[in-house]
């Protein structure tokens, strides 16, 4: 029974790490990356649809993304969604393909992005700590129900803490790497 609690905790912590990686991948670091368009949705026939499901996204140059819709009628909708997004990039539409030229980041914008990365890391740490609390509560319930001994309970709580520390260190490393990537000129 306690092993299920530990396995569940580790699965949930892995999901928190994956969510952080997904969120940080959409922060642009001055280079073209198709993942930066993941959060942009297009109103396609009344349904919010990710751009990646409507078009081929490629990186022909380090600072340029091209978006080639499979359905040419979606071109205007994709253009509108890009203009309304928080990317801060103006799309160039030639009627067949949309080009996004990624401008170099200003020092001010880099600092903003570093803060956003740090904030995302903090949110992931809070999520991991909440998962730790839930796991500790489950172990304490098992101890109260006399399913496990007090010694086993302490041992499991120590394991939970070690696992939490490992995941917190991983969050710190991910955020540090992203900050380094953002600050790289």
From Swiss-Prot:
Biological process annotations from GO: translational termination
Keywords: Cytoplasm, Protein biosynthesis
Top-level division of the source organism's lineage: Bacteria
Keyword Protein transport recorded: no
Subcellular location: Cytoplasm
One MF term in the entry's GO annotations: ribosomal large subunit binding
InterPro entries membership: Ribosome_recyc_fac, Ribosome_recyc_fac_dom, RRF_sf
PANTHER family cross-referenced by the UniProt entry: MITOCHONDRIAL RIBOSOME RECYCLING FACTOR PSEUDO 1 (PTHR20982:SF3), RIBOSOME RECYCLING FACTOR (PTHR20982)
Described function: Responsible for the release of ribosomes from messenger RNA at the termination of protein biosynthesis. May increase the efficiency of translation by recycling ribosomes from one round of translation to another.
Family: Belongs to the RRF family.
NCBIfam families listed in its UniProt record: frr
Protein name per its UniProtKB record: Ribosome-recycling factor
Gene: frr
């Amino acid at each position: 029974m306690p092993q299920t609690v530990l396995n569940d905790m580790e699965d949930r912590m892995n999901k928190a790490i994956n969510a952080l990686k997904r969120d940080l991948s959409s922060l642009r670091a001055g280079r073209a990356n198709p993942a930066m368009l993941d959060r942009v949705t297009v109103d396609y026939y009344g349904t919010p649809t990710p751009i990646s499901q409507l078009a081929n996204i490629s990186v022909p140059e380090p600072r340029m993304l091209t978006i080639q819709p499979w359905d040419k009628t979606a071109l205007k909708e994709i253009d509108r969604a890009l203009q309304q997004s928080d990317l801060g990039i103006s799309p160039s539409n030639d009627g067949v393909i949309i080009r996004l030229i990624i401008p170099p980041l200003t020092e001010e914008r880099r600092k903003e992005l570093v803060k956003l990365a740090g904030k995302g890391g903090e949110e992931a740490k809070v999520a991991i700590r909440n998962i730790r609390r839930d796991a500790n509560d489950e172990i304490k319930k098992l101890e109260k129900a006399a399913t496990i001994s007090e010694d086993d309970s302490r041992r499991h709580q120590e394991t939970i803490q070690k696992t939490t520390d490992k995941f917190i260190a991983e969050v710190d490393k991910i955020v540090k790497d992203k900050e380094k990537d953002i600050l790289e000129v």
